[in-house]
Amino acid sequence: MIQSHVSVMLNEMLEALSPKAGESYLDCTFGAGGYSKAILESCNCYVTALDRDPNVIKRAEEIQQNYGERFDFVETNFADSFAKLKEKKFDGIVLDLGVSSMQLDIADRGFSFLHDGPLDMRMSGQGLSAEEFVNAAEEKELADVIYKYGDESFSRRIAKRIVEYRKTARIDSTGKLAEIVRSSIGFRKGKIDPATKTFQAIRIYVNDELGELEQFLVNVKNILKKDGRLVVVSFHSLEDRIVKNFFKENSEKPVVRSKYAKDDMTIDPNKWLKIITNKALAPSDKEVGLNIRARSAKLRAAKAIYE
């Protein structure tokens, strides 16, 4: 059963995407369908949604029943979507890089340190699981992954404790891993759960989330129409840095050759984006108060000025 999910920065996403009737949009991270539904309700437009999680298919079918041919769903991760989308181009593309409540709140999915379940964390159910990684990786690799993808300053201490624990028993549940992490660094008053960063790091690693994001951005120009908008909502500094650098590297203000000829400008055709959000947008205090999972969200948007 899919749990209730609250889409993060929904209004800001719609404002940045600016959907128009008759146009086509790509929701690269369907999840519980919050973004897709909001775009479809905003005007008489079309949405193609992607997700590698087979558990969302039922929700996609529900939306398709309501919106008919205006909605289409493709089961794939966004990095591998280009072949399945063939030569289709879109007027706008949106990515919500966060983990949905339907993944976090269902214990059997193995994402949550709050709900005990099998230590899995795979979004597609395929490939290396968190259990396999945690029980097989060398101490240094564990520490490096937890530090790099979780920005966890206690990564070495946590990795050492994991290796010590698995000498006596296999770490096969989220509850076990969470307790190992907590016992390594302890609770700090007013701080997030000590297991938060470690679980984030392992999830990012086993799903190759950053690699998929980088691969998608390299190819996104091929599916975004001229004047089409790219909107990305990220949830931690590594994702945001990738998006920020991509926007910066692919956008450039026109250079005026002469102060007397303002229309005489040279433009690098490889700089195909115009940044819409000069700085990353953050959720309002009100939204964070209603949905604590929004606290780390950042939204960046850009527009294609060339195809």
Curated annotation (Swiss-Prot):
Record carries keyword DNA repair: no
Principal location? cytoplasm
Database matches in InterPro entries: RsmH, SAM-dep_MeTrfase_MraW_recog, SAM-dependent_MTases_sf
Offer a single GO CC term for the protein.
cytoplasm
One Pfam family this chain carries? Methyltransf_5
Keywords (alphabetical) are:
Cytoplasm, Methyltransferase, rRNA processing, S-adenosyl-L-methionine, Transferase
> Record keywords: Oxidoreductase included?
no
Q: Where in the cell is it found?
A: Cytoplasm
Which reactions does this protein catalyse?
cytidine(1402) in 16S rRNA + S-adenosyl-L-methionine = N(4)-methylcytidine(1402) in 16S rRNA + S-adenosyl-L-homocysteine + H(+)
Please list the residues that bind S-adenosyl-L-methionine.
33-35, 51, 82, 96, 103
Annotated EC: 2.1.1.199
The alphabetized list of GO BP terms reads: rRNA base methylation
Molecular function in Gene Ontology: rRNA (cytosine-N4-)-methyltransferase activity
Residue ranges of coiled coil = none
The record ties this protein, via PANTHER family, to:
12S RRNA N4-METHYLCYTIDINE METHYLTRANSFERASE (PTHR11265:SF0), S-ADENOSYL-METHYLTRANSFERASE MRAW (PTHR11265)
Recorded family membership: Belongs to the methyltransferase superfamily. RsmH family.
The protein's role, per its UniProt record: Specifically methylates the N4 position of cytidine in position 1402 (C1402) of 16S rRNA.
Q: What is this protein called?
A: Ribosomal RNA small subunit methyltransferase H
